Design a protein with these regions (language model features):
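Active-site beta-alpha connecting loops in nucleotide-dependent enzymes
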Residues: 98, 129-195, 200, 204-211
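Short glycine-/acidic-enriched loop or helix-start segments at secondary-structure transitions
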Residues: 12-15, 34, 152-153, 180-181, ...
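Short glycine-rich anion-binding loops that position phosphate/pyrophosphate groups of nucleotides
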Residues: 8-9, 119, 146-149, 174-177, ...
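Active-site glycine- and acidic-residue-rich loops that bind
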Residues: 115-124, 147-154
């Protein structure tokens, strides 16, 4: 069996030639399993319907529509593999997530810090939507470390579109991951394209007091009640931890 998100027309087109059993899930009514009554906040709660009849209810300790959809896919795959519904439901409801995915880090002077591994526009969009759902009305501040010159070049317009969504974005130098720089693909170019962005002209591999001027730059901009997120696949999570230490020492 193939378990696919039927909300995406492209996936349905790709699956059309296959003769295997295909099970579609999602938010739309034309799916085999439909997710309804979604509350995508601190804990996602939702109901699952199959052929217009209620199949089960789920509550997972992870926020966001994408996590709700992922958990529904896991539930369907589990039952298709022969696991009974009650056991599958309990297992999914007890799953607490993984590191670097919407990971709570700390709170300093009313500022809440999270970390997420998101480094592709689709992931980033889902992350931002989750924070907006969980913390409506609060300022979203993002510390973004671009990852790979080629990825930034290939998805440039998509990155710029998503990075315009937060209230403030700090952009570090691009984490090269052994790639050769590409002319025009720079942190400065990102900042120039995103009105609410500031350049953190730093390398996330730096350590010690060399980081302090950039931490001071951040401290001057963030406010109590902000939601701050380190975002990227390089070393930005380590910088986030050092930033928290700095803010505690300079409160």
């Amino acid at each position: 069996s193939l378990v696919c998100c039927g909300d995406d027309p492209m996936i349905r087109d790709l699956m059309a030639p296959f003769s295997k059993k295909i099970i579609y899930y999602g938010l739309n009514a034309n799916n085999d399993y439909q997710l309804k009554q979604l509350e995508p906040f601190e804990n996602c709660e939702y109901e699952v319907y199959c052929e217009e009849e209620k199949y089960c209810s789920l509550k997972i300790p992870l926020p966001g529509r994408h996590n709700a959809l992922n958990s529904l896919a896991a539930l369907i795959a589990s039952t298709e593999a022969g696991i009974d519904l009650e056991t599958a439901t309990q297992g999914i409801e007890n799953f607490n997530g993984v590191g670097r995915r919407f990971e709570y880090k700390d709170e300093v002077d009313g500022v809440i810090f999270y970390d997420d591994y998101g480094h592709h526009p689709t992931e980033i969009k889902a992350v931002f939507n989750s924070f907006r759902d969980r913390y409506p009305g609060r300022r979203l501040v993002v510390f973004f470390e671009p990852h790979r010159y080629t990825r930034m070049k290939d998805c440039w317009e998509e990155f710029i579109k998503e990075l315009k969504e937060p209230d403030l974005v700090f952009v570090t130098r691009i984490y090269e991951a052994s790639e050769t720089p590409i002319p025009g693909v720079t942190a400065e170019a990102i900042v120039a394209s995103v009105p609410k962005a500031q350049l953190l002209d730093m390398n996330t591999k730096w350590e010690g007091e060399k980081l302090n001027p950039y931490f001071q730059q951040i401290q001057d901009e963030i406010q109590s009640n902000d939601i701050c997120v380190t975002l990227g696949a390089g070393k930005i999570n380590v910088i986030g931890e050092k930033l928290i230490e700095y803010l505690k020492d300079h409160a």
